[in-house]
Structure formats: structure tokens, C-alpha cells
Amino acid sequence: MAARNEIRPIVKLKSTAGTGYTYVTRKNRRNDPDRLVMKKYDPVGRKHVDFREEK
């Protein structure tokens, strides 16, 4: 059961707009070994911005 968590860990995506809004998602470490960056909607800033993975 521990292998499942190692391959696809849960990560937080924090808004780069500085609003403090976060999304929670899973990522595959084999396909994305670097920090994840996704463009998503920030409801606090009311626009689409980049969300970066935080540790």
C-alpha cells in the first residue's frame, strides 16, 4: 500500500497571483519529476493564473 503513495503523491498547487488560494491534486512522479505548474482559475483574483507546486 505504501508504493501507491510514493508513485502518485498528493500535492498542493499555490496561486502565483499572491492571493493564497490553493488547489489539491495528485501527480505522477514518473512522468513529472519536477515541480508541477498548471494554469487554473483563481476565484479570489477572478482570473486564470499559474499555480505552482509547493512542498
From Swiss-Prot:
GO terms for molecular function: structural constituent of ribosome. SUPFAM superfamilies: Zn-binding ribosomal proteins (SSF57829). GO terms for cellular component: cytosolic large ribosomal subunit. GO terms for biological process: translation. The keyword Repeat does not apply. Pfam families: Ribosomal_L33. Keywords: Ribonucleoprotein, Ribosomal protein. Belongs to the bacterial ribosomal protein bL33 family. This is Large ribosomal subunit protein bL33B.
